[in-house]
Amino acid sequence: MNQNKNYRVLFSNLYKDTQMQENAKMSEHINFRVGGPVDILLTPNTKEQIVETINICKENKIPFYVLGNGSNVLVKDSGIRGVVIKLSEFDNIVRDGNTIKAESGALLKDVSAEALKASLTGFEFACGIPGSVGGAVFMNAGAYDGEISFVIKEAEVMSEDGKIITLSKDQLELGYRTSAIMKKNYIVITATFCFESGEKDKIEGRVSELTNKREEKQPLEFPSAGSTFKRPEGHFAGKLIQDAGLKDFTLGGAAVSGKHCGFIINKSNATAKDILDLIEYIQKEVKKQFGVDLYPEVRIIGED
C-alpha cells in the first residue's frame, strides 16, 4: 500500500471522495500556475473538518500546509509531500450590523462586495486583492493606503497545540506583512471586521477607481503572485528593480513585468525554478547596484 492510499484511508471517515484529490497538480491551485503535485489535497468545508484534519496530520506526523486562494504562494517543481488543506470551500460570510464575519477561505473581493452592499466603508482597498481572508490576516495584506489591521476586530485561530482561541486586534500584532499568526504558526479559522457606515455611491466610486487603477498598472493578464518582494524601508521594490535595468528582463518563462517591475510574471510556461532563479537574480542585482536587500513577499513552499 503506497503512502497516498494510506492518506485516503486515513481521511475517508472525514471526507467525501470529491473532497480528496491524490497527486493534485499544485499548478492548478495557485495563481502563479506553477508547481509539482501534492500527495493529497483536501477541501474541508467546516471548522470541525479543518480541526480534525490537522489533528490527524499531527498525530500521524504527516506534514501539512494550509492554503487559502493560492494567490501569494510559489510551489516548487518537485511538489509537496504530505497534505495540502485548501480552504476555498470554507467561505461563508455573515454580516451583523457594522461587522462582517468571514470564514478563512472567503475571498477578500467577496467581503468587499458584502460591505459595499450594506454601505459599509473601510474595505474598498481589498476589492481587487485576489487573496482569501485567512491569508490576508496571516500577512496583514494591504493595498492603496489600506490594510487588514485598519478594519479587523478579532480572529478565531487554531494554535499549535490544537486549541481554538480568539485573538483581539492587539493580540494579532499586525505589522507590515507580518502578524502573531505568522510568528506563532497559528491557523486562521474566521475573522471579524468592523466598519463605518458610509455613502454607497462614494464607496462604489472608490471601488471603481481602485479597480481601474489596478487594471492600468498591474499585469493582470499574466499569472503572478502580486508584489513579489516586500517593500524595503525607505524604498519601493518596483522602482529599485526598474532602476537596476531589469524591466522586462526574462529568465526562462519568467519575466519582470514591463507594466509594474514589482511583479514577476509567468510569461511563457515558466517553471517554479525559472521564477526562483529570477527572484535570486533580482536580489543580487539590486544588492550590487544599490546595497539594498529585497525579501520575497511571496511564500515559497515545497520540495527541492
Curated annotation (Swiss-Prot):
UniProt record, GO biological process: cell division; cell wall organization; peptidoglycan biosynthetic process; regulation of cell shape
Keywords tagged on the record: Cell cycle, Cell division, Cell shape, Cell wall biogenesis/degradation, Cytoplasm, FAD, Flavoprotein, NADP, Oxidoreductase, Peptidoglycan synthesis
Catalytic activity: UDP-N-acetyl-alpha-D-muramate + NADP(+) = UDP-N-acetyl-3-O-(1-carboxyvinyl)-alpha-D-glucosamine + NADPH + H(+)
One of the record's GO molecular function terms: UDP-N-acetylmuramate dehydrogenase activity
Domain FAD-binding PCMH-type: 33-198
Subcellular location(s) per record: Cytoplasm
Main location: cytoplasm
Any one GO cellular component localisation term in the record: cytosol
Pfam families (alphabetical): FAD_binding_4 (PF01565), MurB_C (PF02873)
Pathway: Cell wall biogenesis; peptidoglycan biosynthesis
Cystine residue pairs: none
Class of enzymatic activity (EC top level): oxidoreductase
Listed InterPro entries: FAD-bd_PCMH, FAD-bd_PCMH-like_sf, FAD-bd_PCMH_sub1, FAD-bd_PCMH_sub2, MurB, MurB_C, MurB_C_sf, Oxid_FAD_bind_N
SUPFAM superfamilies from the UniProt entry: FAD-binding/transporter-associated domain-like, Uridine diphospho-N-Acetylenolpyruvylglucosamine reductase, MurB, C-terminal domain
Enzyme Commission code: 1.3.1.98
Active site location: R177, S227, E297
Cofactor(s) the protein requires to work: FAD
Family of this protein: Belongs to the MurB family.
Chain's role: Cell wall formation.
HAMAP family, A to Z: MurB
NCBIfam families on file: murB (TIGR00179), PRK13905.1 (NF010480)
Full protein name: UDP-N-acetylenolpyruvoylglucosamine reductase
Species of provenance: Clostridium botulinum (strain Eklund 17B / Type B)
Lineage, uppermost ranks: Bacteria, Bacillati, Bacillota, Clostridia, Eubacteriales
Name of the gene encoding the protein in the UniProt record: murB
